[in-house]
């Protein structure tokens, strides 16, 4: 494993310097391109709720200054001598992972996201001991293992959030058999219609599932049905609507990050139904045992995805023309966008125009 300790490249970016979370211009150093590395000119970077948690140190682990961003797309400007899969000019992306041990059981199965030594794209510790900086910056140096190709059919701006939101829902949908050919016609419930939820709806429809959106907001029904082509919409606070859906769904993807009870949601599953949690509430969710026991139901969780799955997902998105619905923001409006993101005032993902052209 080649390590490149010489951080000599000066890079301009945007960072939070303290728990106020205010993003300011920040000049820092990145490592030189190593033999296994790919240097990328950043074009676009999506804004994730995780960025909010890190800039405000909500989890008590932020290492300031922190340069956020793990939904990164751009163009290759340099490749190392050991890099065979990429060349200068390629359209590429980098998601949540900067490094892993490459040798454990998880890495050997391309489940790098579950490696004990995983290093995140930002606020992580890289192999050489340096702190990782994310995609709110003009360029990035990434190990070849953690770079994916972006199909020519996908715009770089709308593809960026797929590297987090997309893979976060794709991975469990694949692992639990929702995207297999024989799953067509089965019934999927998507709890929450935000950055993750709207992509889950798109995957479900692309693979022939009957999709029901489950939301606390009646105002989202038109959006779900008309724009995302959901087959059904249920207001989770309406007891009559929820009771009418009892034992009707084969699968449920719960994308909600707010604390909520899983009991009413579990009742919507058929016997042997599967509920997958991908949202991360700050407080524990309520999980009653009776709906599990009497319905032989399964609850599981999932955290992003490995690199093989991420490339597979991106290729499928290229084939089915699946992208995220986004709002482009300029670098001088990052703080405004973060404030709106904190209020969930976005449909459905902000993407920073770092150095790109939305027509790419």
Swiss-Prot record:
Keywords: Lignin biosynthesis, Metal-binding, NADP, Oxidoreductase, Zinc
GO MF: cinnamyl-alcohol dehydrogenase activity; coniferyl-alcohol dehydrogenase activity; zinc ion binding
Record's catalysed reaction(s): (E)-cinnamyl alcohol + NADP(+) = (E)-cinnamaldehyde + NADPH + H(+); (E)-coniferol + NADP(+) = (E)-coniferaldehyde + NADPH + H(+); (E)-sinapyl alcohol + NADP(+) = (E)-sinapaldehyde + NADPH + H(+); (E)-4-coumaroyl alcohol + NADP(+) = (E)-4-coumaraldehyde + NADPH + H(+)
Biological process per Gene Ontology, one example term: lignin biosynthetic process
Chain ranges passing through the membrane: none
Pathway: Aromatic compound metabolism; phenylpropanoid biosynthesis
One Pfam match: ADH_N
Positions bound to Zn(2+) 1: 48, 70-71, 164
EC number: 1.1.1.195
Function: Involved in lignin biosynthesis. Catalyzes the final step specific for the production of lignin monomers. Catalyzes the NADPH-dependent reduction of coniferaldehyde, 5-hydroxyconiferaldehyde, sinapaldehyde, 4-coumaraldehyde and caffeyl aldehyde to their respective alcohols.
Record PANTHER family: ALDEHYDE REDUCTASE
Record's protein name: Probable cinnamyl alcohol dehydrogenase 6
């Amino acid at each position: 494993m080649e390590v490149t300790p010489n951080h000599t490249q000066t890079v301009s970016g945007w960072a939070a310097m303290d728990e106020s979370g205010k993003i300011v211009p920040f000049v820092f150093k990145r490592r030189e391109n190593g033999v296994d590395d790919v240097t990328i000119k950043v074009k676009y970077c999506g804004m994730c709720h995780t960025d909010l948690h890190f800039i405000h140190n909500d989890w008590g682990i932020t290492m300031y200054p922190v340069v956020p961003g793990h939904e990164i797309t751009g163009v290759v400007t340099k490749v190392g001598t050991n890099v065979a899969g990429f060349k200068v000019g390629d359209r590429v992306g980098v998601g949540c992972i900067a490094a892993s041990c490459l040798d454990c059981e998880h890495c050997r199965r391309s489940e790098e996201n579950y490696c004990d030594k995983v290093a995140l794209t930002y606020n992580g510790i890289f192999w050489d001991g340096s702190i990782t900086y994310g995609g709110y910056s003009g360029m990035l140096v990434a190990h070849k293992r953690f770079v994916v190709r972006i199909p020519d059919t996908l715009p770089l701006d709308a593809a960026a959030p797929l590297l987090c939101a997309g893979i976060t829902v794709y991975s469990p949908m694949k692992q639990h058999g929702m995207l297999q050919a024989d799953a067509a016609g089965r019934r999927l419930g998507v709890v929450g219609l935000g950055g993750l939820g709207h992509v889950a709806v798109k995957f479900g429809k692309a693979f022939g599932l009957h999709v029901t959106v489950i939301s606390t907001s009646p105002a989202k029904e038109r959006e779900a049905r008309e724009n995302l082509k959901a087959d059904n919409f249920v207001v989770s606070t309406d007891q009559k609507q929820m009771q009418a859906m009892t034992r009707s769904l084969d699968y449920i993807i719960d994308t909600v990050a707010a604390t909520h009870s899983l009991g009413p949601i579990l009742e919507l599953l058929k016997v042997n139904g599967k509920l997958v949690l991908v949202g991360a509430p700050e407080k524990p969710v309520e999980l009653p045992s009776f709906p599990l026991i009497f319905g032989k139901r399964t609850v599981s969780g999932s955290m992003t995805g490995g690199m093989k799955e991420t490339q597979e997902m991106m290729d499928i998105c290229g084939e089915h023309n699946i992208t995220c619905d986004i709002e482009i923001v300029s670098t001088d409006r990052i703080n405004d966008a973060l404030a709106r993101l904190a209020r969930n005032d976005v449909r459905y993902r902000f993407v920073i125009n770092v150095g790109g052209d939305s027509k790419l």
